[in-house]
Amino acid sequence: MAQTLAMMSQFNGRKRVRKFFGKIPEVAEMPNLIEVQKASYDQFLMIKEPKGGRPDEGLQAVFKSVFPISDFSGTAMLEFVRYEFDAPKFDVEECRQRDLTYAAPLKVILRLIVFDIDEDTGSKDIKDIKEQGVYMGDMPLMTSNGTFIINGTERVIVSQMHRSPGVFFDHDKGKSHSSGKVLFAARVIPYRGSWLDIEFDAKDIVYARIDRRRKIPVTSFLMALGMDASDILSTFYNKVTYERVESGWRIPYSVDRFKGVKLVSDLVDAESGEVVAEAGKKLTARTAKLLVEKGLKAIRVSEDELLGSYLADDIVNYETGEIYLEAGDEIDEKVLKVLFDVGANQINILDIDHMSVGAYIRNTLKVDKNESRQDALFDIYRVMRPGEPPTIDTAEAMFHSLFFDSERYDLSAVGRVKMNLRMGLDCPDTVRVLRQEDIIGVVKMLVELRDGRGEIDDIDNLGNRRVRSVGELMENQYRVGLLRMERAIKERMSSVEIDTVMPQDLINAKPAAAAVREFFGSSQLSQFMDQTNPLSEITHKRRLSALGPGGLTRERAGFEVRDVHPTHYGRICPIETPEGPNIGLINSLATFARVNKYGFIESPYRKITDGKVTTEVVYLSAMEEAKHYVAQANSSLDSEGRFTEEFVVCRHAGEVLMVPRDHIDLMDVSPKQLVSVAASLIPFLENDDANRALMGSNMQRQAVPLIRSEAPFVGTGMEAIVARDSGAAISAKRGGIVDQVDATRIVIRATEDLDPSKSGVDIYRLQKFQRSNQSTCINQRPLVHVGDRIEKGDIIADGPSTDLGDLALGRNVLVAFMPWNGYNYEDSILLSERIVADDVFTSIHIEEFEVAARDMKLGPEEITRDIPNVAEEALRNLDEAGIVYIGAEVQPGDILVGKITPKGESPMTPEEKLLRAIFGEKASDVRDTSMRMPPGTFGTVVEVRVFNRHGVEKDERAMEIEREEIERLAKDRDDEQSILDRNVYARLAGMLKDKSAIRGPKGFEKGQKIDSTVLNNYPRSQWWQFAVDDEKVQNKIEALCNQYDESKEALQRRFMDKVEKVQRGDEMPPGVMKMVKVFVAVKRKIQPGDKMAGRHGNKGVVSRILPVEDMPFLEDGTHADIVLNPLGVPSRMNVGQILETHLGWACAGMGKKIGDLVDFYQETGDILPLRQRIENLIPDNDRNEPVRQYDDESLVKLAHQMRKGVSIATPVFDGAHEADINAMLEDAGLDSSGQVTLYDGRTGEPFDRQVTVGYIYMLKLHHLVDDKIHARSIGPYSLVTQQPLGGKAQFGGQRFGEMEVWALEAYGAAYTLQEMLTVKSDDVAGRTKVYEAIVRGDDTFEASIPESFNVLIKEMRSLGLNVKLGDAREFMAQQALPEVVEN
C-alpha cells in the first residue's frame, strides 16, 4: 500500500461503521435532543449566580414581581435581596432507591426595613434594617437526562403549546347570524389578566366585552379611557370642509377620495364652473391624478349631495352657548334648513362614503346611551360586579386594575412584541400593560378589516402559538405559591411587634413549597416518564401538548387545531402524533427545531448571498420565515453552491411555488428537519403512506429492550445520535486511559482537563438490571478494555436497546413474504422455533414488589420467617429474617417476604382456657399477611432492599446489605486513591529527577543528585522529604503536596458522608416501621399472542411458532425466520418495508462476501482483496468513515463487525434509490429482483413461484400476551353488588353482558342462563352452597335471590316505596274479593 503509517488511523471497534447513501451534505449540527428541557429549566433556576447578579427572568423575576411586600400601614417593608441553593442532600441514585425527591434546599436572603413615619408631615425615615436568609422549601432539580425524580419515580414535564399573548383579528365565517353575514372580532389576550374582545354585531355596531361578560358599546369603553364623543369621531374619521358658494357647496378635490369611484353626478370645477368629468364615468387612479395635474383644486357640489352625510363638529351659537346640531348628526332636509337659518357658511363633514369608510363608530356612538366618562365607568363596573352599587372611585380603581395595573395585567414581552408587529407600533417590550393608543389601534384595525382592508389572523399559524417549557410552567406555579404567601405575610406584619421580629418570623414557606409539590405531583403536564426504551424517553421529553391547564380540552378542540399547518414545516413533525382522541393535540418537536426566548419554535436555514448557498445557518420563527423564499434541502446545486435549475421549487408564506432562482434567499439545512426523531429513524420513510409512518413512529416507542440488542442493517444514521442524547449509552466526560473495568463500573484515569480542584479519576457506575418505569430492564454493558485510550465523547458502555452506541430496538430477521397455510391471515406472523431457541426476541422484565410493616392498633406487624400454619417447604427461599434470597427462582404463590399481623383477641373456649392455665401465655394471635408472588408470574429475585425507620433496630438482612454497600464505597475510594497516588508520585518523580537535593530522608547525603535508583531506595511516602536547590521546582513540589493532601481529605470526606447516609435510618411514611422491596426478573420469550411490528407500521400478532424444519428454506438450506403476508403491503401503501427487505438482503449478502475474504486473509495473510472490497463498499466522502486510512488490524476488526451484515444508512428523504439497491444486490452477487426460489420445509418441494426474501428489522412490542391473559377461579367481589370485580389487576372475572344474555336466551339455555346470573355472579348464599356441593362431589345446586335484586329493592325503599317479597298465592287469598249483594 502506498499509504504511509502517519496517514493510518485506528478503528477501536466501539462504534458501528455505516455506509451512507445520503447525497446532501450536513451543514448544521443537530442540536442536543433534550436541550428543550435542560435549557429551559437552567434558565429558570440559574443556580450559579452570574457576575453582576441574575437578570430578571425565571425564579429571579418571580421574587422581583412579588417583593417588596409592605404592611397595610406602610411602617415596614420586606425586600428580596437574592436567593441561593445548597447542595442536594441525596444524589439521583439515592433518591431513586429511597423514594425521595431529588431537590436542593432554596435559601432566600430577605431584608426587613422598618420606617419611622412623621405624623405631621407623613415623611418616612429608615429606623432599622435586618437581613436574614430564610429557608423556602426544596426546589426539584433536573437530572442530566432532563427528567425529575419525584418521590423516587422519574417524571417528565411536557412542554405546552398555547395561544401566544397579543392581539388577534378573526371573523366567525358567517356562522353566528342566520343571514350568513361575516362578523369581525378582535381579541387582546394577555399572559395573565382580563381578556378584551372587540366585535361587530349583525347591525354593524361595535361592542367591547371584558372576560366574555355582557357586551357594552365600544364607545363607552373609549369614554372610560377619557375620550368624549368629538374625540372619538376625530380619532376615527377624517374631516372634509364644505364652504357655501352661490350655487351649492365647494369642497377640496382629493385623488384618494375619487379614485376608483363611479360618478353619480357631473364633476364641476369650483373655480371655472366647467364639467371636468361626466356622470356615470368611473375615475381610474390615473384619470384622478391627471385632473390634479390639469389644475383642479376644488369642486362644486349641489345641496342634495350633502344629504346622508354626518356633521363632524357641533354647530354652536357662541354667544348663547346653544347647541343647534351635534357632531355625528345625519344631514337631512331639516338639518339643511337649520344650517341655512343659523347662517353656517362653512361646515366640517365626516369623510364617510359607506364604500371604503363605513359609519360603524358613528352609529355605535348614536346607539350608546352613556354620555360621559362617569356613566361609562359605572356601566363597566355593573358588568364586572353585578349587584354592587358603584361609586366613582371604586369604578375608576376597578377599571384601572383591569388593563393598566402591572400587578393584575401582564401582556408579557411576547405579547408586546406580537402587538407591535401586528399593529406597526414601536413600544419597548418592558411596557407590559395596555396603553390608550393600543386599544384605539385595535379598534381602528378592526374597522379597517370591516371596510375590506387588511387580513385576519390564522390562529393555527405557529407564529401565533407558542411553547411553554418546564421553566416557564414552573415560574407561573411558583408565582401562585408566593402570592398565597404574600397575603399571610401582610397579615402577620400587622399583627406582630415589627421592631423585634426577624424576616424568618414573618415567613411561612409552606404555600410556596406546596405549590411546587402540587405542580410536580399532580399537574396534567407532569407525567410519569415513558421509559420503555431510549427512544420513548427522548420522544416524551420532546413532546408538545395543547392540553393541560390554560390549554385546550379534547372535546372542544376542532379539526383546524389538530390539522397539519404549513408553518409546522421544520418545527413540528407532521407524522408523529397519537391515534385516537388526542390526535393532533399532542405533537413532537422536529429534529432540528429549537425554542427561542419568546417561546416560538425556530427552524434552521442556510443563507443565500448573491445566488450562492452558504454554510451560514440562521434560525427563524414562523413569523420571520413568512417573508422569505425558502428552497428545499434537496434542490440541486453545482460545485460552487449555485442552483443548477433556472426555476426552483420553494416555499413562501405557506404556499409551494416555482420561482426564478435569483428570488430565493434561504434554503433548508437538511431533508430530515421536517420530521421528528422517531420518524427520522424509519428508512425509506418517503416510500410509506403517512398513516402507516405515524403507526411506525409510535410503535418504535413501544419496542421492548431485548436481551441481545442488534442495530439494524438498514438504518438512517440517526441511531447513534438518539443513543447518545438519550443517555442510555454512556459517553466519556473527558479523555483518558481505562484503568479498571468490570460489569458494574468503569474507572478511567483522566489525561485531559486536569483541573487541580477536580479529581483526576472518572468512575462510571453502570446500571445493572434496574427496573424502568415500564418494568423493562435497564442494563448497561462496558465496551472498553483496560489500557484503551478514550477520547471525550466516546461511547464506553452500551445501555438498554443500544448496540455499539447505536439505537437497537429490535433484531434483523430473515423474512419471506408469502402466505403459509393461513397462519399469516389478517397480519398474523409466523415465526421459526429458532427465534425462541436462540433468544432472538427474549426480553427481561423486572417486577417490583413492596411490603411494609406498620404499627397497628393491636400491636406492630412483624417481618419474620416464623409464620403460622405454613409448611417448611414454603419457606425454603427465605433467610432467617424472613426475606427471600437473591437468586431464588420463584413462582406463583411463593412467599417473597414473610409478615405477620396481630389479630383481635377472640373469646376463648373452655379447652383453650385450660391449656392456657397449664402452659402459661399462648402464642399471640397473629395472621399470615406475607407477600406472595401474584398468579402467572415466574422469575428470579435480582435485588432486595430493606428500609428501616430511624431508631428501629436493623435485622440481619439489612445489616448485610449495608455492609455490602459500604464495601463497594470503600473499593471506589481505594481505587480512586491508588490512581491519585500513582499520578501524584509520577509527577513528583518527574520534578525530582536529575535535581540536586539540599535535604532528604534519613541516610541521604546532601547535594547528591536524585535519580530513579535513589528514589527506589525509599518508600514513596518519604519522597516529600526531599528538598531541591532549584527554588521554582521546590515551590511546585510544595504546591503539589498541598493539593495532594486536599484531594485525599476531600476523598475521605466524600466517603464518610456516603457511609453516614447508608447507616442512617430512612424517612418513612407515618406508621411504617420497616419496608422491603423485592425485585424479580422475569424472562419473557416470544410466544403466540405477542405483538410484533416493523418500522413501517406493519404490525401483527404471532400466530404460531413453527419447528425450524417446517419453515420454508433457501437453496443453501437456510430457513426463513419469519413469514409475513404479502397482502399486508399493497392496500396499506407502506412499500418502505419491501425496499428495506431488499436492501437488508444485499447487506447480508455483502457481509457474507466480506466474511469469506476475512477467512481467506486468515489462511493466506493476503489482505488486499478484503481492503479493496471494503474500500469499494464505503467510498471516501465527508459522510463516510475514512476506511482507506485504516491500518490492517483496524480493517480486520471492521470486517469482523460486518460479517453478519453490512450496516448502511439511508437518511429520510435523501436515501437509497431503486438503482442503488439494484447495484448493491448485484455487488453482493444476488439477483437484482430480490426474489429467490423457496422450498417448502415439510415436503422439500420448491414453491410455485419465486418469493421476496430479505432481512427486515422487527420489534417486539410492549403488548405481551403474558401481561394480558388471565383466568379466575375464586376471587374478590364488589362490596355493594357482590358481583366479581373486573380486570387482571383485581384478579377479576369476565363480564357476562347484556348481549351475551340475549345469546343464551336465543338458544333457550335457561339453566345455563340462570347459573350465569345467580351462582356465578352475585347470589351469595347460592355460590357458597355450590362450593360446598363441589367439595362433597355433588353436582346439584339451587339458586336464590341475587344480591343486585336486593340492591334494587333498597333503592326503591330509599325512594319511599316499601317493597316486600312474598308468595303470590297467599297474597291473592288475603285480598279475597268482597261479595256483591244484589238488592
Curated annotation (Swiss-Prot):
Disulfide bonds: none annotated. It comes from the Bacteria. Keywords: DNA-directed RNA polymerase, Nucleotidyltransferase, Transcription, Transferase. GO terms for biological process: DNA-templated transcription. It catalyses: RNA(n) + a ribonucleoside 5'-triphosphate = RNA(n+1) + diphosphate. Its EC number is 2.7.7.6. GO terms for cellular component: DNA-directed RNA polymerase complex. GO terms for molecular function: DNA binding; DNA-directed RNA polymerase activity; ribonucleoside binding. It holds the Pfam family RNA_pol_Rpb2_7. Transmembrane segments: none annotated. It is an enzyme of class 2 (transferase). DNA-dependent RNA polymerase catalyzes the transcription of DNA into RNA using the four ribonucleoside triphosphates as substrates. The RNAP catalytic core consists of 2 alpha, 1 beta, 1 beta' and 1 omega subunit. When a sigma factor is associated with the core the holoenzyme is formed, which can initiate transcription. Belongs to the RNA polymerase beta chain family. This is DNA-directed RNA polymerase subunit beta. It comes from Bartonella bacilliformis (strain ATCC 35685 / KC583 / Herrer 020/F12,63).
